[in-house]
Amino acid sequence: MTSTTESYPPIEDRYVSLLWAEAEMAEELALLHAQLFDPAWDANALRDLLADPGASALVAKVRLRELGPPVPVGFAIGRVAADEAEVLTIGVTTPFQRRGIGLKLANGLLRAVATSGAKRLFLEVAKGNAAALGLYHSLGFKEVGRRQGYYKGPDGSSADALTLGLDLTNKP
């Protein structure tokens, strides 16, 4: 079995569902986070985060077979504090990347934080993550800062993070 996108059928909207994540989904989210990020957040950290009244989290699930159960393939977590919000983490597993699922998650999170009264939304993204940068720029995010050496690799390397911001006051 390969992990390329060619191994999977094209994804139609009827096969993708977005669900609001609850604290009870922390184990499931921790497994996804471990596939996507190093270091990964554990279930306890995610459970605590999901219990925060200012947090919003979405899980993307895909139905791979007409009658099969949906499989979690991505998630997004954000948090609102006063009139600002931040995307804490967003990711889609490799076989399902570049298929519109990240955009669905980002748009869902955008709507959630915008309706909560946040005026600006911020996030950090690795400077070299072209796919994520393309997504965020398409949504209107602009670079507002840079954090040198923010991301640490398992081999001791580091990568700069770009801080991106989005004005939510002009969003419908």
Predicted regions and their residues:
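Conserved catalytic-core motifs of GNAT/GCN5-like acyltransferases
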Residues: N44, F122-E124, H137, K142-A159
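Conserved beta-strand edge residues that scaffold enzyme active sites
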Residues: R47, L64, K127-G128, Y150-Y151
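Short amphipathic helical patch at the helix-1/turn junction of helix-turn-helix
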Residues: V92, A126-K127
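Acetyl-CoA-dependent GNAT
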Residues: S3, I11-R99, L103-A112, S116, ...
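Short glycine/proline-centered loop/turn elements that form peptide/ligand docking sites
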Residues: A106, N129-A132, G149-D155
